[in-house]
């Protein structure tokens, strides 16, 4: 057994993961499983669920992967009941489910607000209400990890309610972490920034300069886009005993953008937190002309 395996203490533990079948979620589940964790996953995407099942089956992982809506309290309850029957313990909860749409606040209404809050905040409350009593009853402590976003920590024009919901998750986690600390349960957040995934691409809107190396170098101090493993590594760390004295905080696997955050209202293209491609192209052309 390696030093990490000895210190991490993940082998044989059980993790409930909401939204764990695609993109970031699948990377997190697969990395947890690689460290001996038995995952119980709920995800709305039926194709992604089937794909994740196949991957875990081929790896010989003991798992529960079910198609369902984590925003539905009954579906969440059913998943936890399956975990009770199968393994009789919950050691880790990872809340990944999230989503939004881009629109100015004045162009949205109560139906849109409710959908965003239900997706990004309410399901976290339901999942925690199911996980915490089980962790307390188990007497082994536990770790709750919420996937939030850099937008919980800065202005996000076009995403007012989404950023507010994610900020609410952050504050909920801080408060819950204090309430459950005497039980040895830790609560933390992981707030990534730009990690290219199909879901991120589907949001659209604004300029696309972050798809170019030049744009990434301008926007991200470390000079590259994030990888799903940058996020999954953070989750594995927070699930493990290597972080046993860390609670009520947020990890930022973002290449430094939280430290350097700034939104700019570029002429003709509106709000963006990066330099538009047309400006980069003009600058490159000017440099070439001068040369």
PLM regions: where:
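Active-site helix of classical SDR
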Residues: 128, 165, 173
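Residue(s) in the substrate-gating loop at a strand-loop-helix junction
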Residues: 149
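Active-site loop immediately N-terminal to the catalytic Tyr-X3-Lys motif
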Residues: 106, 154-160, 182, 223, ...
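Canonical Rossmann dinucleotide-binding motif of NAD(H)/NADP(H)-dependent dehydrogenases/reductases
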Residues: 3, 7-40
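Short-chain dehydrogenase/reductase
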Residues: 244-258
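Alpha-helical segment proximal to the catalytic Tyr-Lys
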Residues: 133, 178-182, 244
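Substrate-binding pocket helix/loop in short-chain dehydrogenase/reductase
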Residues: 104-105, 109-117, 216
